[in-house]
Amino acid sequence: MVALNGKVVIVTGASSGIGASLARGFSREGALVTLAARREDRLREVARSCLHEVLVVPADLLRPQDRETIVQETTARWGRIDILVNNAGMGMYGPFLQTTEAAWRQIFETNLFSMVFLTQAVLPVMQTQGEGLVLNLASIGGLIAHAEKVAAYVASKHAVVGFSRGLARDLAGTGIRVLAACPHLTATEFFRFSPGAEEMAPTVEKFKSFMDSPEDVAQGILNQLDSDRLVVFPTAKPAKVFEKQRDI
C-alpha cells in the first residue's frame, strides 16, 4: 500500500458513499484531505469523522470557478496536490428511447466533463511537482453493459475508462500516474438520487445482498494505489462479473 502520511488528497463527491469512505480512509492513513461536493452540511459531517486535518470546499464541479477554487484553496493550505480522486458522479436508469437529449448531456457533464476539467485544473500543480496520481472512479459499467436500461450510464462510464487510458498515455514518463477504479453495485444513496430511481428500486432491492459496502470498496481502492495496472477492481465481485460477461 502507498504511504499516505502527509500526502495531500482532493476527493470529489466526498459528502456520501464511496467518496466519504475514501476521505475517511485517506485521513486514517495520515493524509491531508480536501473534501469537495455540493452539500456543505454533509461535507462537514464527513469532516468530523476524519482523523486528521481536512479542508471543506463546497463546490459544484460543473462550474469552472468552483473547480478553480478547489485547486486554489488546496494549494493555499498545503502547497501541493499529491492525489486527485475524481469520484463525483450520478446514475441514470430508464429505457433508451425515453432518455432525452438533456438527460444524456447531464450525465456526460457530470460523470465525464467535470472530471476532465478538474483534472486539467490540477495537472499543472502535479507537473510542477514532477509526481502525482489521478484516480478516476469509473464502474464495472465502464467495461461491460452490466444491466438493462442503463445505456446512458454505461456510455458515460466507458468514457471515463477511455479518458483514463488516454490520459495515462499522455502522462507517461512525467511521474504522474492514472488509475481507473471499477466497483460493482455498492450500497450507497447513489441509487436513491439517480434519475429513474423509482423504477430502478425493485432491481436495487433484488441485488441488495450482492452489493459491496462503500467501506470495502474504499479500502480495496486504497490497497491498490500502487498498482501497475490502469484498471483496478476494488473487490472480488466486479472482477468476477467482468470475467463472466466480458464477451457479451
Predicted feature descriptions by range:
Residues 29-45:
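Conserved glycine-rich Rossmann-like NAD(P)H-binding loop of the short-chain dehydrogenase/reductase
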Residues 180, 199-244:
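C-terminal helical subdomain
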Residues 139:
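Residue(s) in the substrate-gating loop at a strand-loop-helix junction
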Residues 59-69, 101:
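The beta1-alpha1 cofactor-binding region of Rossmann-like NAD(H)/NADP(H)-dependent oxidoreductases
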Residues 95-96, 103-108:
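Substrate-binding pocket helix/loop in short-chain dehydrogenase/reductase
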Residues 15-16:
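Conserved glycine-rich cofactor-binding loop
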Residues 119, 156:
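Active-site helix of classical SDR
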